[in-house]
Amino acid sequence: MSKKITSIRGMNDILPEQTGLWQWLEAKVGAVLASYGYQEIRMPIVEQTDLFKRSIGEVTDIVEKEMYTFDDRNGDSLTLRPEGTASCVRACEQHGLLYNQTQRLWYAGPMFRHERPQAGRYRQFHQIGVETFGMTGPDIDAEVILLTARLWKALGLEDKVVLELNSLGDSADRARYRDALVDYLKAHFDDLDGDSQKRLERSPLRVLDSKDTGTREVLKGAPQLADYLNDEAVAHFEGLKALLDASGIAYKVNPYLVRGLDYYGKTVFEWVTDALGAQGTVCAGGRYDGLVEQLGGKPTPAVGFAMGIERLILLIEQERPELSAPVDVYVMAMGDVLAPTMALSEHLRDALPGRAIQLHCGGGSFKSQMKKADRSGAAVGLIMGEDELASGVVTVKPLRGQGEQVQVAQGDVANAVTSFLE
C-alpha cells in the first residue's frame, strides 16, 4: 500500500465543521469594515523576494529565517508572502491608487512563515489586514483603533482584549535612542539571554520585545524611547491619546512595545489577551509613513493593522456563539418520487432565499434517511412518499426541540417551514 500523503506540518486543513465559525467571523468583520467605508483589495500570495527584503528588513527574523523563498524556472527569487502590508503597498503603487488620493483598504488571506508550529502559531496562517494611505494626522490612527474596538464588540471579545500603545518617533529619534539603548545593554550584556545578546548588534530595539525574565529585569532600568521623541512625534502621540480618551477607548502605554517589522514609525499598537498563553497578540499595527517611498513611490503617510484569524477563532471558541446549522431543511423521498421531491427542493430554494435546503441522495430506508437528517443538523425534515404525492401534501417533521409532525399542502410548504424555523 502506498504511503498516505498528509498536509505539511503547520499548514492545516479547515474542515466543514470549522468553516461555519470562520464564515461567521469573516461576515462580522466584513460588515464592520464596510460601515467605515473600507474597500477590499486582493493581492497574489507570491511576490518578488526583494519586496520583503526592502520592506520588512534584511536583518529581521522573518527575512533571515522564516520566509518560504524559491527560484522559479527563470531564475527569479520568489517568496510566499509572510505578511500583507508590503504587498498592499506594492499593488497600490503599481496601479496608481496613491496618486493624489487617500485610500482605505482591507484584505484577507493566507500568509506563510517557517516557524515552530504551536497553538495560535502556524506556518500557513490567515490574516485580515487594514491599510490606509494619504492621511497624516492622529485622527486616522484613532479611526483604525476605533474600528478594531468595534470589531471586538461584533465578535463578543471586548472583555478579552486590552489595547497597548507606544510611539516610535521618526528614524532620527530611533537612531538616537538606539545608541543610548546599546550603551546601556552592553553594560549589562552578561545578564541578557542568548537571543537578546545576538540582537544587540543587529537589531537592538528588538531586545525590548524579549520575554526572558532576566532580560525583562535589565530593561526596567533601560532608557525610555519617549525621552528621545521629537516635538512633532510627541504632539502626534498626545493627539491620538486625547482622541481615544474622548471616544472612551481604554489603553495602556507600553514603553517596550516595538514591532518586528522595520518599516514602523510613530504610532504602534497591539491588542493583547491573557487567554491564549504565549500567543497573546491578536491584532497589531501602526504607522509606516516611509514605506511607500522605500518601495519606489512618493512619500505617503500610511497606517494599518493585521489580525490573526486563527487566534481569533481560538478566542471565540472559548465562548462559542450559537451558530446556525449548515442545513435548515432536510428533504427526503420515500419510494418512486425522486423527481417531484427534487422539484419541491428547488421550489423551496426559490421561496426561502438564504435558507439551506438539502435533498437526501442515494435512497435508503426511512430509518436510514432519518438518521442522516438528524446528523445534518437541520431543524426541519420534509418527507414525500407516494401517498403524499397522490394526496398533494408533504409531511413536515421538526427535528429539533418540541413540535408534532404535520401534513401540509404542497403549496403551503414554504410557509409551514418558515413557522418551524422562526
From Swiss-Prot:
One of its GO terms (cellular component) is cytoplasm. Its EC number is 6.1.1.21. CDD domains: HisRS-like_core (cd00773), HisRS_anticodon (cd00859). The keyword Cytoplasm applies. One of its GO terms (biological process) is histidyl-tRNA aminoacylation. Signal peptide: none annotated. Gene3D superfamilies: Anticodon-binding domain, Bira Bifunctional Protein, Domain 2. It is an enzyme of class 6 (ligase). Belongs to the class-II aminoacyl-tRNA synthetase family. This is Histidine--tRNA ligase. It comes from Alcanivorax borkumensis (strain ATCC 700651 / DSM 11573 / NCIMB 13689 / SK2). The lineage of its organism: Bacteria, Pseudomonadati, Pseudomonadota, Gammaproteobacteria, Oceanospirillales.
